[in-house]
Structure formats: structure tokens, C-alpha cells
Regions:
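Intrinsic disorder in cytosolic terminal tails and internal cytosolic loops
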Residues: 1-13, 197, 457-491
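12-transmembrane solute porter fold
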Residues: 15-37, 50, 125, 231-235, ...
Length: 491
């Protein structure tokens, strides 16, 4: 049955929906953030080089970014709750495989399977809220969802550090199993089903395959570029060709996975370009920072995770309010100021070296980063969702998430290459510190580019497109389709 569009806050029905969506999205967020803190220990236990650690992050991002559009479309057509529950179940089973992995190769393969589950559950969590809540309460509902999601992302590094030092890094993945055992029954009992009655036609499997192939080939070429071989160069060219073919197929397909018409909304296009800049910087920053604190500053996994906790307090206090603020003043200022604050935080991280003092070297940067995230998170998602028809909530969520994950994927693959890291860099404090100091200005520059783009192109949403996909709902205010991951490497 169709989801009732009139669920209000605060009611028991609203609380059950929020509990389900927060639990589901938190599985993906926690997994992304806790993994970064565990990377050094994973490398030691599995005798893995830096490229294997990159793939531990990127295998997940690759399948997530490649299939998240398909996941949103599946939810719109077959039922958002049904696909969400399938995604949570798949994610939990893949997490179990990660936790039992005997080698880095098996772990990477299981991480790729995790990304498939993430692609099914991630767009569904926000789409369920969008389809279930009354328009007057959507801003608060998504703000609450974003706030708890941001808290989960911020707590992730602390939790990951505690798990690594306690029961072991494998529990970083096994933790998802009990979360799924809670989430699935609640969803089946208390969350109404919803779908898009306009969804029809054939699935764009060729588009999905070409998109995945393009991302996989380009990522492989970036990770392996240090070899300087002809095979790597040909792989990169093949990836570009697959990307061009993807664009061609999407323009020709009767039912494309990525409908070109949705980009008829200038606002939607602009905010996704900003997303690419922001999440590329976040992806590189959080991947490298988790290693910098442990390899160079000498922090234990628990101490490195605990260092990120100031962002938790800021997200808890202000995330639920930031969506409403953006609704009043428009998204242009928050989407400009937020990236600039985050860029300043990345430059402040240059103070973190050997024997870094937390109060004077680490904390100031993380406080500024938290302020930037709070400023940016809610308006980003609010603007994305306000730029499309609510019936295409799953598609819009998928596109923005795909942009965020693809940006993080490329950043994690490219930054070690751009900064001169080799496979053993994370085992040497001096070598890693030098690369980190080259990487932070690059990430900051990308954020500044995003801020300039936001100031130049983003406006208060107003209808300007005849396509149903491009209708805007100015009363929808919310956060990034996934809050930024404070331990990862992008959302």
C-alpha cells in the first residue's frame, strides 16, 4: 500500500519510522567510519600493503556508488520498505563475511558485497522519511535523522578504536549483525510501504554495468598508477571510454537509470557539483587523518577515535536546527560558508605531527571541522530534495549519494598517488607525515572550489522546470543524503 503522507511529529508512528531509518543508515555510516580507524591494525594482521588498505575502503565505495542509483529506482518501483529491508539484510550478511575474512583479498571481496547492500538501504532510508511524513514535519524529521546519523558517523571512530583495542578489528564488521536483527523486525512491523506509481518500464542494466565499469577501471588505474605501466594507462583510457558510453546510453535509453531530464533543474545540477567537491575533500581527509593520528602522532586506535568526538557534540546540538535555518535564509550562504570552514580545518590539521598535543594541535581543527559540517550537512540535502518531485525521492537520494561516494572513491585512490605515497608509507612516520602535509592543502583547495561554485550557482529553490522530476518543494528542508563520514574515506 502507499505510505500515508500525513505522519506527524511527535507520534508513535513517527518515532518507529525514525528509529528504523536511523538504525539502517547508521549501519552504513558506522561501518564507513570505524573501518578507517581499524586500517593500520588490519594491515598488520593481514600483512597488507597500502594498496590493499585503499581497496578495503574503495571496494565498498565502488559498488555503493555504482549501484546506488539502481537501489533508489528499485525502491521507487517495488517498494521502498521492501528494498530497504533487503539492503539491511544483505549488508549484515556481507559484514559477517568481512568479520570472518582470513586474507586481505577475501576482505576486499566482502567489502564489495557490503557496498551492494549499502546501495539498497542508503537511498531507502531518506526516501522512507520523505514519503511518510507530512510536508510540515519533513524538515524536522530529516533534521532528526541527520542529527542521529551525524552522531553515528562521529561516534564511529571512537567505537572503532575501542573495538580494535578490545575484542579486535573483526568486530568492526560483526557489530552490524545485531543492529540488523533489531532494524528488520521494526521495519516490517511499523514502517508503511511506499512506492512511485509512475515507475515503469525496463531496468537500465546496461547503464548500471557501464557506470560500474567506468568507476572500477578509473579507480584501479589511479591506485596502480605508481607502476607506470602501459597496462595501467590502457585501463584508464578504457575507464574514460566506459564513462562516455554510459552518458550515451543514458541519453538513448527509454528508462534510464540516470534520467538526463532531472538535470533540467539548475539547482539540482549545481548542488550535485558542490557535493562532488565537498565529498572528494572529505574522502581524502578522513582516510588520511585516521592514519596520521596513529602512524605519525602515535595515538592508539582508541585515542585516535576519541579525538573525533568533538564533532559528535556539535552535530548533536545543531544538526536538527540547521535545516530549518537554511529554509529561512536559503541554501546559498550555508553551502558557501560550510566548505570554507572545513577547508580552514584541514589547514589547521597541518599542525598535527609527531607527539601532537590534543588540546592545541588536534582539537582546534576538529572543532572548526564540526562547525563546517553542521553548517553544510542539512542545507545540502535540503536543497537536493527540494529540487525534485517527492515521487522521485529515491532517485534524487541515489544520485546525490552516488556523486558523494564516487567523489570519495576517486579521492582515496588519487591522493596517495598525488602525494607520493608508496605501499609501505603507512609503516613509516616520516614518509606518511610528508605525504599528509601535501594532501591537506589539496583537500582544502577542492573545498574552496566547492564554496565558490555554491556561491555562484545555488539559489533558493523555485520551480523552473516543466519535467515532473524537476519540480521543487520549497517546504522540504533536510541534511546530506548521508552525513559526512568522520572516519572515512566520502557521503
Amino acid at each position: 500500500m502507499a505510505a500515508p503522507p500525513g505522519t506527524h511529529l511527535p507520534t508513535p508512528a513517527a518515532r518507529w519510522i525514525l528509529l528504523t531509518t536511523v538504525l539502517g543508515s547508521s549501519m552504513a555510516l558506522l561501518d564507513s567510519t570505524v573501518v578507517n580507524v581499524a586500517l593500520p591494525r588490519i594491515g598488520e594482521d593481514l600483512d597488507a600493503p597500502l594498496t590493499a588498505l585503499q581497496w578495503t575502503v574503495n571496494a565498498y565505495l565502488l559498488t555503493l556508488a555504482s549501484l546506488i542509483l539502481l537501489g533508489g529506482s528499485l525502491g521507487d518501483r517495488f517498494g521502498r520498505r521492501r528494498i530497504f529491508v533487503l539492503g539491511v539484510t544483505w549488508f549484515a550478511l556481507a559484514s559477517l563475511a568481512c568479520g570472518l575474512a582470513p586474507t586481505s583479498g577475501v576482505l576486499i571481496a566482502a567489502r564489495a558485497l557490503q557496498g551492494v547492500g549499502g546501495a539498497l538501504l542508503t537511498p531507502g532510508s531518506l526516501a522512507l522519511i520523505q514519503a511518510s511524513f507530512h510536508p510540515d514535519d519533513r524538515a524536522r524529521a530529516v533534521g532528526i535523522w541527520s542529527g542521529f546519523g551525524g552522531i553515528g558517523a562521529a561516534v564511529g571512530p571512537f567505537l572503532g578504536g575501542w573495538l580494535v583495542e578490545g575484542p579486535g578489528w573483526r568486530w568492526v564488521f560483526l557489530l552490524n549483525v545485531p543492529l540488523a536483527l533489531i532494524c528488520v523486525p521494526v521495519a516490517l512491523r511499523h514502517v508503511p510501504e511506499s512506492s512511485d506509481e509512475r515507475a515503469h518500464g525496463r531496468f537500465d542494466l546496461s547503464g548500471a554495468a557501464l557506470g560500474a565499469l567506468a568507476l572500477a577501471l578509473v579507480t584501479y588505474a589511479l591506485v596502480e598508477a605508481r607502476q607506470g605501466s602501459l597496462a595501467v594507462a590502457l585501463t584508464a583510457l578504457a575507464g574514460v571510454a566506459a564513462g562516455v558510453a554510459f552518458v550515451y546510453v543514458e541519453h538513448r535509453a527509454a528508462d534510464p537509470m540516470l534520467p538526463p531530464s532531472i538535470f533540467g533543474s539548475r539547482q539540482f545540477t549545481a548542488v550535485n557539483l558542490v557535493t562532488l567537491c565537498v565529498y572528494a575533500a572529505f574522502g581524502g581527509f578522513f582516510f588520511l587523518t585516521a592514519l596520521q593520528l596513529q602512524v605519525v602522532a602515535g595515538y592508539s586506535p582508541l585515542a585516535a577515535g576519541t579525538a573525533m568526538l568533538p564533532t559528535t557534540a556539535l552535530m548533536l546540538l545543531f544538526s536538527a536546527r540547521s535545516g530549518a535555518l537554511a529554509e529561512r535564509i536559503g541554501p546559498r550562504i550555508p553551502l558557501t560558508l560550510g566548505p570554507l570552514l572545513c577547508a580552514a580545518a584541514m589547514l589547521l590539521m597541518l599542525r598535527v605531527g609527531e607527539d601532537a598535543a590534543y588540546p592545541t594541535d588536534v582539537l582546534p581543527a576538529l572543532l572548526v571541522m564540526g562547525a563546517g559540517m553542521v553548517t553544510l550537512v542539512a542545507p545540502l540535502t535540503a536543497t537536493v530534495l527540494a529540487s525534485v518531485d517527492s515521487g522521485r525521492a529515491g532517485l534524487a537520494s541515489g544520485i546525490n549519494n552516488a556523486a558523494a561516494r564516487a567523489a570519495g572513491l576517486v579521492a582515496v585512490a588519487a591522493l596517495p598517488l598525488l602525494t607520493g605515497m608508496d605501499d609501505e608509507a603507512y609503516r613509516s612516520a616520516g614518509a606518511f607525515d610528508a605525504a599528509f602535509r601535501r594532501a591537506m592543502p589539496i583537500c582544502a583547495a577542492v573545498l574552496v572550489a566547492g564554496a565558490v561554485l555554491a556561491w555562484s550557482t545555488v539559489r533558493r529553490p523555485v520551480p523552473d522546470c516543466a519535467h515532473p522530476e524537476c519540480l521543487r518543494h520549497g517546504n522540504v528542508t533536510a541534511p546530506p543524503l548521508e552525513p559526512p563520514r568522520t572516519g572515512h574515506g566520502a557521503r
